[in-house]
């Protein structure tokens, strides 16, 4: 996999695991894994649907974080190396 998003999960408290930032981190890890999966299995359409659902959920969480805590949003975007939301 091209991105190494590994994080020591034992050092994170239960409260932090429910945070928006951590949820976005977990969804990004799943996106990276599925992207790698599609390099071998290009016609796996049921997994593609799952990827679209994950991307939609991550987009909604990013929009929420953008509205509530912009500084944290910017830091997370830089840390994960993902694109931000489109400007309308």
From Swiss-Prot:
Alphabetical list of Gene3D superfamilies matching this protein: S15/NS1, RNA-binding
Keywords: Chloroplast, Plastid, Ribonucleoprotein, Ribosomal protein
Localization of this protein: Plastid, Chloroplast
Superkingdom of this protein's organism: Eukaryota
Disulfide cysteine pairs (residue numbers): none
A GO CC annotation given for this chain: chloroplast
GO terms for MF: structural constituent of ribosome
GO biological process entries: translation
InterPro entries assigned to the protein according to its UniProt record, in alphabetical order: Ribosomal_uS15, Ribosomal_uS15_bac-type, uS15_NS1_RNA-bd_sf
NCBIfam families tied to this protein: S15_bact (TIGR00952)
Subunit note: Part of the 30S ribosomal subunit.
HAMAP family with a match to the protein in the record: Ribosomal_uS15_B (MF_01343_B)
Name the record gives this protein: Small ribosomal subunit protein uS15c
């Amino acid at each position: 996999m091209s991105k190494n998003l590994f994080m020591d999960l034992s050092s994170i408290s239960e409260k932090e695991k429910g945070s928006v930032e951590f949820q976005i981190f977990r969804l990004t890890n799943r996106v990276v894994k599925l992207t790698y999966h599609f390099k071998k299995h290009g016609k796996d359409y049921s997994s593609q649907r799952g990827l679209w659902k994950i991307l939609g959920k991550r987009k909604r969480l990013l929009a929420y974080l953008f509205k509530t805590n912009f500084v944290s949003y910017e830091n997370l975007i830089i840390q994960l190396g993902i694109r931000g939301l489109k400007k309308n």
